Amino acid sequence: MMLYICSSWKKNKKQLELKTRLFLTKMNKKTIAMLGAGSWGTAVAIHLAKIGHKTLLWGHNPQHVALMAEQHSNPAYLPGIPFPENLIPSDDLIECVQSADYVIIAVPSHAFAEIINKIPKPTQGLAWLTKGVDPASHQLLSQLVASRFGVDFPIAVISGPSFAKEVARFLPTALTLASNNTNYQKKMHQLFHHDNIRVYLSDDLIGVQLCGAVKNILAIACGISDGLGYGANAKAALITRGLAEMTRLGLSMGARQDTFLGLAGVGDLVLTCTDDQSRNRRFGLLLGREVPIPEAEHQIGQVVEGKHNAAQICAIANKNKVEMPICEQINALLHGIVHAQQAVSNLMSRPAKEE
């Protein structure tokens, strides 16, 4: 009799523990507003929805949003990957923000200022996946948010080596999450972290943001080099010296050197410069093959952040008296001042210096 009672008690205890875990899991699920329905915003929205969060995916084009709702996928930017049932497309920006526990921006850098000026102040804080700087003011995106919502407003930037299709397909990925507020950072970490995504924490907002902006320009450079047929040696040199440029700029602005050796720095740089899933690299490949810039952009079909950010990064470097010869040559090429082979020649003929 006692054996039966003990066995029954253990069984009931296990059932109670399971019910408690399920209840706590349900309680921890949140409503997320993902502002930006391009490939990256959609991929992260799919990830968040798959792990149980109700996810509102905002897009600026009503026809695009209607198509996503009808097909339960994003055929324009992430075809072939179905939406979970709890991922809801929307074209109502304000309603998305007001309905959400957490707001994440995933629009291109040139649209970032417009979005934060339209939305009401989020209750918890603001996170973004956008990689770049503001083209009008040459400011980091964190500076724009501070101007809009205050310097003490909790923010987070999520960056690192990550392609949209792989995240949407639940393939293993590691990211860096930088924030100015440890409590908000902890909440965002809990929101994202899962078996397929490992999130590392940082407080170096400047470094993480610069890494995300500069690596796109360097990916264009590597694409051009490969398009010209210059081989692996040249690409390795561009990545290595590009990392040096990125680090110099960051240190001049108060970033930490270890950030540039981490996921947001060398991790994202190597991925973007070497894999053809990178639209910046593919854009560079086309330029190296003498495809005109407008036609190259048309063939890519999505925003090429490196093209939009080259002038801004060079302006920031000039302001901080930092030499960035690779970025400067890419900027000159994008403005029609030099052609691809001349840009390489200009880099190779620079005066000798210590590494």
Question: Which role does the model predict for each range below?
Answer:
Residues W128, P154-S159, V199-D203, G262, ...:
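General beta-strand structural signal in soluble alpha/beta enzymes
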Residues K215, C222-D226, L251-L261, L269-E355:
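NAD(P)-dependent Rossmann-like dehydrogenase/reductase catalytic/cofactor-binding core
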Residues F83, P89-P172, M188:
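Rossmann-like NAD(P)(H) cofactor-binding subdomain of soluble oxidoreductases
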Residues A111, R148-P154, P172-I220, I224-T259:
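Internal alpha-helical scaffold of NAD(P)-dependent oxidoreductase catalytic cores
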Residues M27-I81:
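NAD(P)+-binding Rossmann beta1-loop-alpha1 motif at the extreme N-terminus of oxidoreductases
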Residues Q15-L18:
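Cationic, low-complexity basic patches in intrinsically disordered or flexible, solvent-exposed regions
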